[in-house]
Amino acid sequence: MGAFLDKPKMEKHNAQGQGNGLRYGLSSMQGWRVEMEDAHTAVIGLPSGLETWSFFAVYDGHAGSQVAKYCCEHLLDHITNNQDFKGSAGAPSVENVKNGIRTGFLEIDEHMRVMSEKKHGADRSGSTAVGVLISPQHTYFINCGDSRGLLCRNRKVYFFTQDHKPSNPLEKERIQNAGGSVMIQRVNGSLAVSRALGDFDYKCVHGKGPTEQLVSPEPEVHDIERSEEDDQFIILACDGIWDVMGNEELCDFVRSRLEVTDDLEKVCNEVVDTCLYKGSRDNMSVILICFPNAPKVSPEAVKKEEELDKYLESRVEEIIKKQGEGVPDLVHVMRTLASENIPSLPPGGELASKRNVIEAVYNRLNPYKNDDTDSTSTDDMW
């Protein structure tokens, strides 16, 4: 869904912060899409006696950004203020939290539906949501749709959320029970996710409850006991990231970046740029949350990174000089490098993660460069 631009919008929105023993950074980019429909939430220290708790989420909107924007501002309140979450006096139990998260999703969805019906023109937008609620003892992963979150523990992917796709047997069964069908892996041949907030055109089957509709607003919630020694970082991202990078790939790439910089915004920017250069055509948003035992900057890794950048710079110069008259285009340079066995490329990111370094050298050495052109405008990145 959605139209594409002639060239991607690469300006990024960034934020970072720390508290409760956590550090986070985030980056979002419109990319090739005509509109930016992603939104995000990052809150360290919750109100009402939950100062040691934190909440992070990414919302991937479709058919508009209204639902994503509303959820990023109000979902947390719907979760923490309902009676299921509060439970009895004192800190909420694990079951209180899980029930409260579910209730919060159903409540905000119903609230948005009522607001939409009161308007003359009903809002047809929807949004996925993936998030984490982090208490001193537990991490609660929350997922509704096909955005994804993962936990890297002891240098490996320890947990990741499951995408809610119409082709999933349990999702397909619910869709068919509601009178719908799954065609070309979409709900009624149209919507690519089987759970989402909003999308009220898919939630009007009479005699069915809110979690029995063609599209369900019910999140999956998983609680994981925190491990101070082994927990390293959490990644939350929309499908514009996961379309081109697998779980292990992204975990490896982020870990390698944390060994060369402690700037979490920069790490997230590298993730977004790398995914663009790997061919992602969607909006892209990523939040990186680091625990105290996250990888630290390594002098050895920094030295290897510097050596790699110098090697790439020299190879670009050699490729341009070898051309003789004129200058080869950047696509030719990238394809030449891609055909070579280059040591020490960042795992998961590979050559795409070094595109900015290569392009900077190319532009410096290219006397014919037109500043109005954008090498990313080609469909075939290399």
Curated annotation (Swiss-Prot):
GO molecular function, one term: magnesium ion binding
GO biological process, one term: negative regulation of canonical NF-kappaB signal transduction
SMART domains assigned to the protein according to its UniProt record, in alphabetical order: PP2Cc
Record flagged with keyword ATP-binding: no
Modified residues (Phosphoserine): 375, 377
Processing after translation: N-myristoylation is essential for the recognition of its substrates for dephosphorylation.
Protein name per Swiss-Prot or TrEMBL: Protein phosphatase 1A
